[in-house]
Amino acid sequence: VKYLLLPQTDTRILPFYLAMEEYAARIIKDDDIFFMWQVNPTVIFGRNQLIANEVNIPYCREHGIATYRRKSGGGCVFADMSNIMMSYITCSDNVELTFSRYTSAVVEVLKKLGLNASDNGRNDILIDDRKVSGNAFYHLPGRSIVHGTMLFDTDMAHMQGAITPSTEKLASKGVKSVRSRITTLSEHLAGKMNIEQFKDFVKSEMCDGDILLTDSDIAQIEEITQTYLTPEFIYGSNPRCTNTFQKRVDGVGEFQISIELDHNIIKDINIAGDFFVLGSIDESIIAPLKGVSYTRETLTEALKDLDASTVIASMTTEQLINTILN
């Protein structure tokens, strides 16, 4: 595993680092890649989430907290300079294997610091059964990206104020608030190590060499960054709804379904949520459903060739149809 270095260490906006992942995944083929980064206060929401459902926009504006969408699925997270973001790029196509390989490696690093670390089998890393790291998955041809948080310390007031998880999501985890289900490394390290020392330790344990990006690399990364900054990408689009509902599917995630119907014919549909995406929802699910009747029989026929688990991680086609039908 090689550590990816920038020629300058200035803090950049969050989409730059997401673009850096994409660039590395496309250009560097011979090595697995790892790097860490930090940003000024920012909320990052998943590829298929509705910003109005997940982010307290007035709070973010009032406190100067940036908001950006990423291209991976999963839920909404808050990051600041006390929260280390980690990126891992590998050639594996298997989502479960990629997650497992990465989270297991990070858990082992934390255990070497004497911490009671574990992973929860999906995408979180825990210390004493409380979340210290959440991760998401993004697939490019021939390469997979896992990226996520590592809560060294953070502004809990901003984290709670900026993000608005549904009560159903919290209830599914058996907790009453964001604060009660997370922890920070600083709580457990008790002053033994500062954030820079921790980053140095992680790098030494995870990597066996460096790759230094050039000014030409940076220019190309900045071009990719622009794709994250369009209003269309950040805010997305919703059909004019005649039917909107929310549903949680155990082991898969939370869904917000918006459907535009005309005499019970599906004119448009939007599937949002914090689930993990492995394929194209637009091509594999939405396109086949446009123009069909909103009934179980016609949905089943329209999706008869679909294996939903190849598009949405851990979901069966029957679960998908049940979710769309509410």
Model regions and ranges:
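Contiguous, small/hydrophobic- and glycine-enriched helical/loop subdomains that border
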Residues: 83-123
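Active-site- and interface-proximal helix/loop "cap" or "latch" segments in soluble metabolic
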Residues: 182-185, 261-326
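Beta-rich nucleic-acid/ligand-interaction surfaces
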Residues: 119-136, 218-226
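Flexible, glycine/charged-enriched surface loops at secondary-structure junctions
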Residues: 114-122, 208-221, 296-300, 310-314
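Structured beta-strand/loop patches that form or line metal/cofactor-binding pockets in enzymes
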Residues: 218-263
